[in-house]
Structure formats: C-alpha cells, structure tokens
C-alpha cells in the first residue's frame, strides 16, 4: 500500500473539479497531478519550506552532518520542488469553500481511498498522504525519519542530497497553513523528473506542468456529487449518461445541498 496514513475501511475521498477536469478524468481514466508550485495558492509551498527548515534545525547535531545538508537544501534550493506533482482530495463531499474555490459549476468525484492508496508501490509510485496543518503537525513522523537516516550513515555528498530529497520532497508537499484545516485534505504525491512524462495545460497561472496517474480497472470511482448549478437536474442527466456509456457501473450520483448560488 502506497500510503503511510491510517485509512478507515470504506473511506471515500473527494476530488473537486470543473466540468473539463471531470470529463478528462472519466474519459481518460486517469488523474491529473499538478506541479506543486502551480496550486491555487503557491504561498503554501513557501510556508512548507519555512516549517521544514524549522524542523530540521531541531535535529541538527555535530555528529549528523547530513542534517546540515537537509537544512541547506530546504532553505537554499526553492527549485527543489519542481519534481513534485499533487492531486488533491477532501474528506467532505459537499464543502462550500471547495465549490467556491475549485469547482464552481463542477463536480466532486468520490474515490475509494484504499483504491488510491494501492495505485503503486516502490520508488516513484504515487503516495497517498494526509495533509498536516500547522507548525507542530507531523513532528513525530519526521523525527522517526531523521533517526532512521542518522543510523545508516556515513553518506557521500551525493547520497546526502538523494536522501534529503527522499525525505523532504514528500514532507514539504504535505504541509499547509492551519487556516486551511477545514479542507481536511489528502494528497496523491508523485515525484517525477523524466521530461517525457511531464505534460502541460493552460491554467489560471498560464502554462501548468502536470503528470497523468492512470486509474486501475475496476475503477476506484464510487460517487459523483453534482455541484451547485442553475440546473442541477440537467447536469445530473449528462453525468448519468456519461457513466452509463463509459462503463462506470454502480456509481452513486447525488446533488449538492450547498447554499452557494451561481
């Protein structure tokens, strides 16, 4: 299982998206993970860098020079996260802030969490992780990682950088400010540097790098929530036809009860 977090049996996680994103996911049977720098609020990456640097400082010691390498990399190489791609999910199926921020006139696709966690194993496989909110979250897990690495030295400069990337990239991509805690976010993380795997699409920030994450058969899609819209019944009719004609069986379709008006 490519997840390090506890998943309750039967848990469903929701990906909020607009109509083009919804069609892309169901027609192509894949998820689209965006470069972490091109998420809706890029300041969250800078926040994560600051928090990570603070945590690394807590563990610096004279007999652990590789921790100094971690600190230098987390502070001095902002381009470090260029290889990290994220697909976001929410525990809540009908959250007003998610409709307003990510999917006005769109949909929330419910995925079986265990299906997402099982998308791959080994280096480079997608990892399903729960987002940490605030400076204090994740400290126990990070301490365990540091202790594990410290016990395995000494390392060459190249090995230290590789290990630092292995530790810091996923950790930095799962940290957000406490003000976002309402989202109860989970992320599917992919570390990908091969040029041929990186695609591009237009977005609010211009040209957005992304990678595709293939979904298995049978599909982990369990539910579709029709977002706030002027005519939800018409939206529902289109969704039900798409699901039926593309072989998505047993998918629950329901309508948002959000007070958002478009």
Which residue stretches match the model-derived regions?
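Partner-binding and oligomerization surfaces adjacent to conserved cores of proteins
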Residues: 1-262
